[in-house]
Swiss-Prot record:
Source domain of life: Bacteria
Protein name: Uncharacterized protein YaaN
A Pfam family annotated for this UniProt entry: TelA
PANTHER family in the record: TELA-LIKE PROTEIN SAOUHSC_01408 (PTHR38432:SF1)
Organism of origin: Bacillus subtilis (strain 168)
Length: 386
């Protein structure tokens, strides 16, 4: 958001400093210390000028103007708080946890031991259903691979939703900065007006009242002005409380954004790294298994031919031993495949942990925002009733 746009939003918030028709959906009041230094002295130059102009618009003869002073910005802040709560409530990533849990179940269904060559007896080697068992293993892994691809699409959609949420949160963050700047102008203007009343207007009016004999109206004007200053001081304090909400909202928004970003990165890691690696390793293992079965089948043909032609018990014994040794020879490193799968499952478990932490933090943020919103609403209602 560029500077011109930011100034435009601040101007809109300052356009009606003494209120108007404002809808109040809810608020919260929090305790805050009043600043001991003049806020106007630390404002940017353009906002300092706005504060000075706004201070000049505060009419101490209009008691009712204090009630709605700055309510435009407070109303916008109230709507902003509602947007935050709606975002936290509607954008729950619980579905992501379910998808990741589904992915873990599918991966756990895959047993690397299915790819291991098992020792077979002589008759099994001679007449075993090699092709049938291989097809069963292939069918199982192909089915699981298709299911994992579907889950990957769901994860991709969830990742894009998290990224989209972060863009929306960034817009809310910028709005929060605008409200903070506008409230600073209102507060600074109120402080300037209070300073003028206490150091100039009230003392001058007191002096006039004291110099006028039997002028009770002058005394009443002094009292009215003191009451106005007291109400303005309370109103500035209320605006300070509203500004505190914007200060608290900034880290809360960033916290939600960081959690979303971490979860999106973990999902991305699963999609582009862990799952393809798992599929590649399974494909390699299946290929090696197919090769091993082809070698076994060819060896069986050779053994059978030798047994039928030579009719030699010693040669049969030798060929049987060689066949058994060939069957015991392993071509697939099952331990490596297990470690790859364990690493993938560990990655998913870590992702679930981050997701759960994000859920807890959002719930905490929601509770805090709702508490603040309720108190601010009560405060605005109290102001309306004055």
């Amino acid at each position: 958001m560029n500077r011109d746009q930011s100034d435009l939003h601040i101007d809109e918030l300052l356009a009606d400093p003494f209120g108007g028709n404002i809808e109040i959906p809810g608020s919260e009041a929090v305790k805050a210390e009043k600043e001991q230094v003049r806020l106007v002295d630390v404002l940017p130059e353009e906002n300092k000028e706005k504060a000075i102009q706004l201070a000049g618009q505060i009419d101490h003869k209009n008691m009712q103007s204090i009630v709605l002073y700055g309510s435009q910005a407070q109303s916008k802040l109230l709507n902003f708080s509602h947007d935050m709560i709606n975002h936290v409530q509607k954008k729950d990533v619980g579905e992501i946890g379910e998808i990741l849990g589904e992915l873990m179940k599918k991966l756990e269904q895959v047993n690397p031991d299915d790819l291991q060559s098992k020792k077979k007896g002589f008759l099994a080697r001679m007449f075993g259903r090699v092709s049938s068992s291989l097809q069963e293993v292939l069918s199982k892994y192909q089915k699981t691979s298709v299911q994992i691809d579907r889950i990957s699409l769901k994860l991709e959609h969830s990742k894009n939703a998290l990224i989209s949420d972060n863009k929306l949160l960034e817009q809310l963050y910028e709005k929060n900065k605008e409200y903070f700047a506008a409230l600073n102008v209102y507060i600074a203007a109120g402080e300037l007006k209070l300073e003028e009343l206490k150091t100039k207007t009230i003392p001058e009016l007191k002096q006039q009242a004291e110099s006028s004999d039997h002028n009770q109206m002058a005394v009443q004007e002094v009292n009215d002005l003191i009451q106005f200053a007291d109400r303005l001081d309370k109103r500035v304090h209320d605006l300070l409380l509203s500004r505190q909400i914007t200060i608290q909202s900034a880290p809360q928004i960033r916290l939600i954004q960081n959690t979303n970003q971490a979860l999106a990165e973990k999902i991305q890691s699963s999609i582009v790294t862990a799952i393809p690696l798992w599929k590649n390793q399974v494909a390699i293992a299946l290929t090696l298994l197919r090769q091993r079965n082809a070698v076994d089948a060819q060896q069986k043909v050779s053994d059978t031919t030798n047994e039928l032609l030579l009719k030699n018990a010693e040669l049969l014994k030798t060929n049987t031993i060689e066949t058994a040794r060939a069957n015991e020879r392993g071509l697939v490193d099952i331990d490596t495949l297990k470690k790859v799968q364990e690493s993938l499952i560990s990655t998913l478990e870590e992702t679930l942990t981050i997701q759960e932490e994000g859920r807890i933090k959002r719930r905490q943020a929601e509770e805090e925002l709702m508490m603040m919103e309720g108190d601010l609403k009560q405060k605005l209602i109290t102001i309306k009733e004055r």
